[in-house]
Curated annotation (Swiss-Prot):
Its main location: other. Belongs to the IFT25 family. This is Intraflagellar transport protein 25 homolog. The keyword Ubl conjugation does not apply. The keyword Chaperone does not apply. Keywords: Calcium, Cell projection, Cilium, Differentiation, Metal-binding, Protein transport, Spermatogenesis, Stress response, Transport. It is found in: Cell projection, Cilium. InterPro entries: FA58C, Galactose-bd-like_sf, IFT25. GO terms for biological process: cell differentiation; cilium assembly; heart development; intraciliary anterograde transport; kidney development; left/right axis specification; lung development; protein transport. Detected in placenta. Component of the IFT complex B required for sonic hedgehog/SHH signaling. May mediate transport of SHH components: required for the export of SMO and PTCH1 receptors out of the cilium and the accumulation of GLI2 at the ciliary tip in response to activation of the SHH pathway, suggesting it is involved in the dynamic transport of SHH signaling molecules within the cilium. Not required for ciliary assembly. Its role in intraflagellar transport is mainly seen in tissues rich in ciliated cells such as kidney and testis. Essential for male fertility, spermiogenesis and sperm flagella formation. Component of the IFT complex B, at least composed of IFT20, IFT22, IFT25, IFT27, IFT46, IFT52, TRAF3IP1/IFT54, IFT57, IFT74, IFT80, IFT81, and IFT88. Interacts with IFT27. Interacts with IFT88.
Length: 144
């Protein structure tokens, strides 16, 4: 089974919810595969977004590129709908002045149909997420 970036919109994933949206920096930018685009929060925390894979996947490694994110929680769900999320990963990120935070996480028990990313706190009034990539495999399609 080949490993792919499961989060890319070109692989069928989509951001189905985001707590803030700026028309110049919409949440879809997180998964568009373009390193020049990003999603920005609009102040106040926590902020969150949910990625839907539209299939059952097994994630082995996550890479999150962001700016000013301080504490990040990641929850996962294996339901057909975006419900029943369980706490999966919580990380305190290091502030990197003038450059992107590049957080790589080796994932354990990475079965999911949805991921919810919660930016609990930030180093500034605003934070941005430039990309989320999830290396792994497709387990099965969601049955209707």
């Amino acid at each position: 089974m080949r490993k792919i970036d499961l989060c890319l919109s070109s692989e069928g994933s989509e951001v189905i919810l985001a707590t803030s949206s700026d028309e110049k920096h919409p949440p879809e930018n997180i998964i568009d595969g373009n390193p020049e685009t990003f999603w920005t929060t609009t102040g106040m925390f926590p902020q969150e977004f949910i990625i839907c894979f539209h299939k059952h996947v097994r994630i082995e490694r996550l890479v999150i590129q962001s700016y000013f994110v301080q504490t990040l929680k990641i929850e996962k769900s294996t339901s057909k709908e975006p419900v029943d999320f369980e706490q999966w990963i919580e990380k305190d990120l290091v502030h990197t002045e003038g450059q992107l935070q590049n957080e790589e996480i080796v994932a354990h028990d990475g079965s999911a149909t949805y991921l919810r990313f919660i930016i609990v706190s930030a180093f500034d009034h605003f934070a941005s997420v430039h990309s989320v990539s999830a290396e792994g495999t497709v387990v099965s399609n969601l049955s209707s």
